[in-house]
Regions:
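Flexible loop and strand-edge segments within Gram-negative outer membrane beta-barrel domains
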Residues: 217-221, 231-243, 249-251, 255-307, ...
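Residues on the lipid-exposed face of transmembrane beta-strands in outer-membrane beta-barrel proteins
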Residues: 192-198, 246-250, 293-299, 343-349
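N-terminal periplasmic "start-of-domain" segments of outer-membrane beta-barrel proteins
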Residues: 37-67
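Extracytoplasmic beta-strand/coil segments of soluble accessory domains associated
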Residues: 75, 79-116
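Transmembrane beta-barrel architecture of outer-membrane proteins
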Residues: 95, 125, 158, 175, ...
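A beta-strand signature from Gram-negative outer-membrane beta-barrel systems
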Residues: 132-179
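Transmembrane beta-strands of outer-membrane beta-barrel pores
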Residues: 165-167, 182-186, 212-216, 264-268, ...
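Outer-envelope beta-barrel architecture signal
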Residues: 108, 174-178, 183, 190, ...
Length: 354
């Protein structure tokens, strides 16, 4: 018994020594007791509007929401917003407008990267021509926008549909990124698109987005004429559209931002018209072309003072053509052209921060 007791005492002493030795090997914490500086962190995502503190109703759809819901075009995305009235004037490639409060599309502004899109001839904006491939945030304000740093055009509208495109961001220290997509559907619908991001320096990046869409639209339908029932096809429904959009992003040393964007859109579409008995001929054609160059500059002088300046040149052109014996030369043609120069500057002063 005495020998066993001695063995136990020796083991206990050895265990305590091991514990004390291991405690002495613990290195002191070097995190606390001094200030540490981390490397610069760059945030590339668009800032979402604050729905909680907003004084007006605001609804948003992020790029992730659009992908999860399987939305394929701008009109379907805007239909997700409560209170938005989207009118479709012709299916694939047709005019699509948005309005709020039943005041008409002329009273709803469409903002593309912070600059209002305009069409002086029609008075309403076709949202169907904008692609969802490079959209980062889509938001709808019913009333005045929450962001006070806006132009007078946006304040004069009953509602604002804001489209913010995606800003280039690079993973794994890459200097470029490239993506190709292809969509397809019924009646000859094909729509390929490309996206190219390129880093031009530590403060400068470049993006190029382009897409092409074509469709026949000659879907079949049943025509009932008394006791005669025939199977017909919709004629003169083909559409071809091209869109290209280069954008330059630059951040200055004082953290001010500059965005320079160019946009080109061209479309040629047939106008099928109404179904007329014994007359399937339809020769109406519409061409549309839109080019604009816009720039936006934002700078925060302090926590109280901010400045935003915008400049834009917009060129619109469309041509309508119809063939028929009712015209003097068998052809009717109408061409419309519009050019617009736009400049806006807004200063914001915050007496206090809440």
């Amino acid at each position: 018994m005495a020998r066993r007791t001695k063995v136990r005492i020796v083991c206990a002493i050895g265990f305590l020594c091991a514990v004390s030795l291991s405690a002495q090997e613990v290195v002191r914490d070097t995190i606390t007791g001094k200030v540490h500086q981390i490397e610069k962190v760059t945030v590339t995502a668009r800032r979402l509007p604050n729905k909680v503190t907003s004084s007006v109703p605001i609804q948003t759809l992020s790029q992730q929401d659009i992908s999860q819901l399987g939305i394929q075009n701008m009109a379907d995305a805007v239909r997700r917003f409560a209170g938005a009235n989207v009118k479709d004037y012709g299916g694939i490639g047709g005019l699509k407008t948005v309005s709020v409060r039943n005041m008409g599309a002329a009273h709803t502004a469409v903002s593309y990267d912070g600059v209002v899109v305009s069409n002086c001839q029609a008075g309403q904006i076709d949202i169907g021509r904008f692609s969802l491939d490079n959209v980062s945030v889509l938001s709808l304000n019913i009333g005045q926008p929450e962001d006070l740093l806006q132009s007078a055009r946006m304040y004069a509208s009953a509602g604002v549909l804001s489209i913010e495109t995606e800003k280039p961001h690079f993973e794994n220290e890459r200097n470029s990124a490239f993506r190709v997509q292809m969509r397809g559907g019924s009646f000859g619908y094909v729509s390929p698109s490309i996206r190219w991001w390129q880093k031009a320096g530590s403060r400068t990046s470049f993006s190029l987005n382009g897409n092409y869409m074509r469709a026949d639209g000659n879907y079949p339908f049943t025509l009932v004429n008394g006791k005669y029932v025939t199977e017909e096809k919709r004629n003169n429904s083909a559409i071809y559209t091209y869109q290209i959009e280069p954008t330059l992003f630059h951040t200055f040393k004082d953290s001010s931002n500059l965005e320079l964007k160019a946009y080109y859109f061209y479309s040629k579409r047939g106008l099928p018209g109404s179904v007329t008995l014994y007359n399937p001929i339809s020769d109406e054609t519409l061409w549309d072309e839109n080019v604009f160059i816009q720039t936006r500059y934002k700078k925060d002088f302090s926590q109280k003072w901010s400045l935003q300046a915008q400049a834009k040149y917009n060129h619109g052109w469309n041509k309508y053509e119809d063939k028929g014996n009712e015209y003097a030369d068998g052809l009717y043609r109408a061409v419309h052209r519009q050019d617009e120069y736009y400049l806006s500057a807004t200063a914001l002063y915050r007496p206090w921060n809440v």
